[in-house]
């Protein structure tokens, strides 16, 4: 569990930085450091109640845009985004943040190979 949390967090962060560099940001660390710090702090304090963003809101249209944009850069990153999105949707439903019916549209977009 510790390797899962610590090692994959590094992969997630560095992949985020790579995607931002690909989008033209020269120093993405400055942009993401406050956001990631707050996200980690909130996750440790509040658990699933700290979930925010398009998946927790049930915004399937935004998620579809994200999947397409990431797929243009890296199919591996897009697969990871879809997998983490499905896990996030399940956790958001379990935490009462997302209604099951709203999760259905998200899961359609986040299905492996969909959302392109």
Locate the predicted segments by residue.
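Helical "substrate-binding/catalytic lid" subdomain
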Residues: 1-77
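C-terminal active-site/capping subdomain that shapes the small-molecule cofactor and substrate pocket
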Residues: 50-116
């Amino acid at each position: 569990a510790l390797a899962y949390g610590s090692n994959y967090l590094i992969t997630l962060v560095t992949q985020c930085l790579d995607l931002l560099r690909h989008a033209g940001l020269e120093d993405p660390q400055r942009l993401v450091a406050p956001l990631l710090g707050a996200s980690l702090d909130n996750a440790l304090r509040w658990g699933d109640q700290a979930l925010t963003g398009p998946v927790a809101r049930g915004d399937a249209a935004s998620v579809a845009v994200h999947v397409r944009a990431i797929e243009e850069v890296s199919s591996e990153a897009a697969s990871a985004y879809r997998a983490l999105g499905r896990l996030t949707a399940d956790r958001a439903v379990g935490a009462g943040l997302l209604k099951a019916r709203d999760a259905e549209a998200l899961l359609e977009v986040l299905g492996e190979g969909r959302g392109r």
